[in-house]
Each structure stands twice: as C-alpha cells, then as structure tokens.
Amino acid sequence: LQSNVSYCLYGSKKHMMERMFQNSSYPFYRFGDLFYLGKISETDWTDFICQRFEITGKHISAQLAQKICRVTDRYSSYVQQLAWLVWLRTDNTATETDLQNGIDQLLDACEPLFIQQTEDLSAYQMNFLHAISNGVNTGFTQSAVLKEYQLGTAANITRLKKALTEKDLITTIAPKTIAMSDPILQMWLKRRVWRE
C-alpha cells in the first residue's frame, strides 16, 4: 500500500472531468479538489516561443509568436505543436509562410480525429457548430438565427446544447454563452468542411 501519496489527474475535456468527479455514479466522485486552470498569458507564451527559437539558433518575431497564440487560442498543446511545426520549417527566421504551412500541417495531423468527432453528428448539430464558429454565442432561439443556420425549432436548441456538450465539442464560457471547446476543430470546420 502507498502512504503519503498525492495524485494529480488532469485533462482538457472539461465536461468529462466534471462528470468523473462530480457525478455520484462514477468511481472518482468527490475524490479530491477540482481546480480550473486558466490559460497561459499571450505575453508569457510569446516570450517562451521566442526564447526557444533563439536557443536553437533560429528567430521568430514577437508578432509571429503572438499569431501562434491567437490561432490556437493559447491552448497549451496546440501552441507547442504549432510552434514546433513552424520551427521545423524555419531555416533562420520564421516567416508568415512558415506559419501558414505549420497551420496546414496541424490541421492535417488533427483531421482524422476531427472526422471521427463529427462524422456521426446530425445536420442540426453541424449547423449549431456552424453558428458558433461564425460568432453566434447566445440568442440561438431567435427566429433569425434559427432560420439562417437551419437549427429547427427553439425547443431543439436545448437538445443540441446538451448533446454537443456531452461530446465535449462545445462549452459554456459564461451564463448562456456557448463557445467551441477546440479552436483547431473550429478552424478545421471553417476551412475544410464549410470552406470559409
């Protein structure tokens, strides 16, 4: 047996993690404390990316490092992956072309997972994601939104939110305000599914 041991369980699937620790039917119910960690600041990421490039004899401008942060919405795994992809393509100084090629490579790498996550979604669910991707975060039951995004009836919105939250594709970021859970999935949908 172990004594004086602490465990740290972590993950980015917020809804799943909450269910594991807050639902009495799960084995980790009230297992410990939940901590919601904020994202690393853009300034800290920018400094880190620039320093890591410099250490290896390459250079990336602060502006390009900031773009990496903004494209990935500062999601740690994506920031690191995209920065690495840009670093791989950089001879001496990273360029906008290196960044765009890195983004394409990131989308290519994530595509099989994104196909798997979206292939069984209903047309209404895809339309709901489309609305969110286009900046609709509230007011889904308004007739103009229902019509523009073909979401069905106002009663359908509750079911859509529930189903997509359970799949960890969307998250509530403020009262009655919804966002995509994964910024790269959102980009993939916009660029490669809806061709926007």
Label every model-predicted segment.
Residues 13-16, 42, 185:
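Short, solvent-exposed loop/turn segments at secondary-structure junctions
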Residues 20-21, 49, 83, 174, ...:
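Short, flexible helix/strand-to-coil boundary loops that buttress conserved ligand/catalytic motifs
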Residues 46, 50-113, 123:
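Amphipathic alpha-helical "lid/sensor" segments that cap RecA-like P-loop NTPase cores
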Residues 8-9, 37, 181:
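Small/polar loops that bind or transfer phosphate-bearing groups
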Residues 33-44:
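Conserved AAA+ ATPase "SRH/arginine-finger" region at the nucleotide-binding site
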Residues 112-196:
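C-terminal leucine-rich, beta-strand-based interaction scaffolds used for sensing/assembly
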Residues 1-25, 31:
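Sensor-1/coupling segment of RecA-like P-loop NTPase cores
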